[in-house]
UniProtKB/Swiss-Prot annotation:
The active site is at C186 (cysteine persulfide intermediate). This is tRNA uridine(34) hydroxylase. PANTHER family: RHODANESE-LIKE DOMAIN-CONTAINING PROTEIN 7-RELATED (PTHR43268:SF3), THIOSULFATE SULFURTRANSFERASE/RHODANESE-LIKE DOMAIN-CONTAINING PROTEIN 2 (PTHR43268). Its EC number is 1.14.-.-. It is an enzyme of class 1 (oxidoreductase). It catalyses: uridine(34) in tRNA + AH2 + O2 = 5-hydroxyuridine(34) in tRNA + A + H2O. GO terms for molecular function: oxidoreductase activity, acting on paired donors, with incorporation or reduction of molecular oxygen. InterPro entries: Rhodanese-like_dom, Rhodanese-like_dom_sf, TrhO, TRHO_N. Keywords: Oxidoreductase, tRNA processing. Belongs to the TrhO family. One of its GO terms (biological process) is tRNA modification. It comes from Burkholderia thailandensis (strain ATCC 700388 / DSM 13276 / CCUG 48851 / CIP 106301 / E264). CDD domains: RHOD_YceA. It holds the Pfam family UPF0176_N.
Length: 296
């Protein structure tokens, strides 16, 4: 049976998350859903999967139940399909931030940086400049191991290990962005939204966020100006520009991404180890977990 995978986030002030947590958990369990929902005073970030009927029912619940006071009435969801359930369990977690930047003064609900949609961005990249004639710089806000799976052509990648490092690398590399149109991007939009707001706050001009992130770009225009796949924080590991799971897997031991060619190595033992587990190996290794707390 086909599994429906949903992702969504919203920055909005929430003051009842402690009361909501058991109620949302009970509803998800009753519907047979699995995944992770993060609740914080600044908003919601969720990745869930289940049957079509279950996911539709949950969307209706979030958008229309009086419990949520209309805060999610028009919450957009990104959808993809898989042949199996990518999550092992259902978790509803309370967090300080739905994506950790350690910049509590940022309040995206009070005003976002401008956004550019997939079709407009493709037009800019086709031409090599934006509508004002400025060169366009793609800025990857994701962790280094995610970038290694795939990214936009010629994107700036500052090899961060966690999103809270982003403000520091921007301060150190401001010259890369001056006089250009900067488009921040990430998997689903949440990190590039916070990143764009931060850049505007520190005085960097002509900053945009990619609306809906890489996954929305794939959905609308495919893989134009992009090379590789997109890492996702679940057991699918990566999606190609057609939003289909790839042959990449995540190593059970070290959590590195193991592409198809590395799976042919004698050092790869499914469920036990991979080439990156061994000292001296030069393959990709990352200290990460398949945890949406790091994502989108």
């Amino acid at each position: 049976m086909t599994t429906v995978n949903l992702a969504a986030y919203r920055f909005v002030s929430l003051d009842s998350i402690e009361q909501w947590r058991p109620l949302i958990t009970a509803r998800c369990n009753a519907l047979g859903l699995r995944g992770t929902i993060l609740l914080a005073p600044e908003g919601i970030n969720l990745f869930i999967a289940g049957s079509r009927g279950a996911t539709d029912a949950f969307v209706d619940y979030l958008r229309h139940d009086p419990l949520f006071e209309g805060k999610f009435a028009d919450l957009p969801f990104k959808e993809s399909l898989s042949d199996s359930q990518p999550f092992r369990r259902m978790l509803v977690r309370l967090k300080r931030e739905i994506i950790t930047m350690k910049k509590p003064a940022i309040k995206p609900e009070l005003g976002r940086a401008p956004s550019v949609d997939a079709r407009m961005l493709k037009a800019w990249l086709d031409r090599g400049h934006d509508d004002a004639g400025r060169p366009v710089v793609m800025l990857d806000t994701r962790n280094a191991f995610e970038v290694d799976v795939g990214t936009f052509d010629n994107a700036l990648d500052y090899r961060i290990d966690k999103f809270s490092q982003f403000p520091g690398v921007i301060e150190a590399n401001r010259a890369d962005l001056e006089g250009k149109t900067v488009v921040s991007f990430c998997t689903g939009g949440i990190r590039c939204e916070k990143a764009a707001i931060h850049m505007k706050d520190v005085g960097i001009e002509n900053v945009y966020q990619l609306e809906g992130g890489i996954l929305k770009y794939f959905e609308e225009v495919g893989g134009a100006h992009y090379h590789g796949d997109c890492f996702v924080f679940d057991y699918r590991t990566a999606l190609n520009p057609q939003l289909a799971p790839t042959a990449d897997v995540t190593c059970f031991a070290c959590r590195a991404v193991v592409p198809a060619d590395a799976q042919q190595s004698p050092l790869y033992v499914p469920g036990k180890s991979c080439p990156a587990c061994h000292p001296g190996d030069q393959g990709r290794r990352a200290d990460h977990r398949a945890d949406p707390a790091h994502a989108a």
